[in-house]
Amino acid sequence: LTALQWQDVDLKKRILTVRKTLQRIQCQDGVTKTKLVITEPKSESSKRKIPIPAHVIPLLLKFQGNKNEYLISGKETPTEPRTLQYRFSKILKNVNLPSVHFHSLRHMFASRCIRLGFDVKALSEILGHSSVEITLNRYVHSSFEQKIEYMSRLK
């Protein structure tokens, strides 16, 4: 998310293209411990095109920057992933919600998509997973309420 630039967003076609990733890696120079690097995603399936829902376009238009600016920072330099987590934690605290990691939003998104009836293969591709097993086993979490609804369908 932190590696996305406006050049990766086609508002007319409503497509977001994931073509790079930002990560903190260990330095081998002995001077600094870690550094931020932008690289290609870890697998071919991680490189992907994601349809943007129509209702999101007005929000993106409101914040749209030049093609070299990053979506999250609004600048030509990316937001440090740790900064994103810190800001997310601060928002959760301010609205009295339990602390969770920012990455948990991917899990919540996947579970919600399944509850809404998304095809697992399509969801797996949206998430950039190499297989539906990764999506189902690591990202999709069933709720007890959902189980109640399923069981009530039995007659």
Which residue stretches match the model-derived regions?
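Catalytic-site neighborhood detector that most strongly recognizes the C-terminal catalytic loop/helix
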Residues: V9, L22, I57, L127-S152
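Residue-level detector of conserved, well-ordered beta-strand and adjacent loop positions
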Residues: R19, P53, S73-G74, V140
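Short, basic (Lys/Arg/His-rich) helix/loop patches that form interaction surfaces
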Residues: I50, G65-Y70, G74-P78, Q85-V132
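Conserved tyrosine-mediated DNA breakage-rejoining catalytic core shared by Y-recombinases
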Residues: A3-K62
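Alpha-helix C-terminal capping segments
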Residues: L60-G65, M151-L154
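Short, surface-exposed helix/turn micro-motifs that flank interaction/cofactor sites
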Residues: T2-A3, S124
